[in-house]
């Protein structure tokens, strides 16, 4: 095995998906603790509660603007190199969150044991399904009251349409939480509260049919055996092929706050999740062990601090090796660039990078020339597929405070749309400009950046648009008929694509029924 192949085999690149407040931030801290990247799990010990005291580096990042370090974290674990990509929480949820999932090879789904499957999780799982991403599941908050675990598994299967295979099974919950039983291994991992800050070796009780296990479970023993019989009769067994194809998820139970069960999940990522996978380009399929460097940009992050105009373009390496100072071809522009200052995001620091391999995420300084979906190579003309625009879920009409600045407004919005900060639609029937976003914060970011960078002040007005769909049709005549009939709701997006702005869900259903030859797409590839 070449050194490059060995490096690729070590990589695991995954993202965490969850609904806000399911414990994603806590599990991220504990995963970093597993990799010893944060000495005290990102949390400064305060006497009573760890909840509000985050570490200095997070505070510093907040003052500097949107945190970059928390977007990508790289840390070693069990002789592997883990690349963990964060998907932002509630306030800063945006299309970036969806696109981040196009840059990973697997995902960790975190569910709140008291609430089960929630709306944001469903939306993120839909994106994972576009590429059949393998999913590991962690049911969190066992140190609180949770719903019946069997009910939770049923809900995963019914709502997320994926088979659920429990790997561990909880013994009690809340004050009675005693640990988990490993179904295939026939051993109990004992929960000892109060080790949220440190890595401790959990006590193991071999065999459920043992005096030690009976003593540990006490009065619960017989009831647990009954429940286990039910679980083993009704649940799926883990199957590696089904997992890799995104059809089955292994399920673990634990409490991230109590630092229990997180290592089981990370072990699953190392043992079962795929190493960096081949990526499909329009021209051919690119294998990660190829010698020549290739990569694509899936996210551009602007620094909110006006003093730092730098934007970081996040690139997933698909093949070859990045070396400091190497020459790369920016395929869309045809320009060759020498990249001497790419960033890595090791643990909690932004550092200049010496080398990186397939599966790694690197940051390029971007002065407005790089767009989402751009490919970089050592000269080959390649364009990777599967980096989509997603149909926005929220819409606003833009109103200019100074009508003389409409040119600057259009220019600014065009730039921000290319960067992925928002989507812009120009209705066929009016001079309105409509913005689309996935999270409310995107609108605030756009307004503040228009003001700072383009000296344009704007306000937003509500508008009756439920969703957007990109339109295509193989029959030119039918497409023309459709355009005449649907003119009222048609727009052109920032990339020049025909889009249908549906005022209601019912309207969209009716249109899809009436025009069976017209494709109404909820995603559109970046070109």
UniProtKB/Swiss-Prot annotation:
Its main location: cytoplasm. Residues 9-277 form the tr-type G domain. InterPro entries: EF-G-like_DII, EFG_III/V, G_TR_CS, P-loop_NTPase, PrfC, RF3_C, RF3_dom_3_sf, RF3_GTP-bd. Keywords: Cytoplasm, GTP-binding, Nucleotide-binding, Protein biosynthesis. The gene is prfC. The keyword Cytoplasm applies. The lineage of its organism: Bacteria, Pseudomonadati, Pseudomonadota, Gammaproteobacteria, Pseudomonadales. It is found in: Cytoplasm. Belongs to the TRAFAC class translation factor GTPase superfamily. Classic translation factor GTPase family. PrfC subfamily. Increases the formation of ribosomal termination complexes and stimulates activities of RF-1 and RF-2. It binds guanine nucleotides and has strong preference for UGA stop codons. It may interact directly with the ribosome. The stimulation of RF-1 and RF-2 is significantly reduced by GTP and GDP, but not by GMP. GTP binds at residues 18-25, 86-90, 140-143. CDD domains: RF3, RF3_II, RF3_III. PANTHER family: PEPTIDE CHAIN RELEASE FACTOR RF3. GO terms for molecular function: GTP binding; GTPase activity; guanosine tetraphosphate binding; translation release factor activity, codon nonspecific; translation release factor activity, codon specific. This is Peptide chain release factor 3. One of its GO terms (biological process) is regulation of translational termination. One of its GO terms (cellular component) is cytosol.
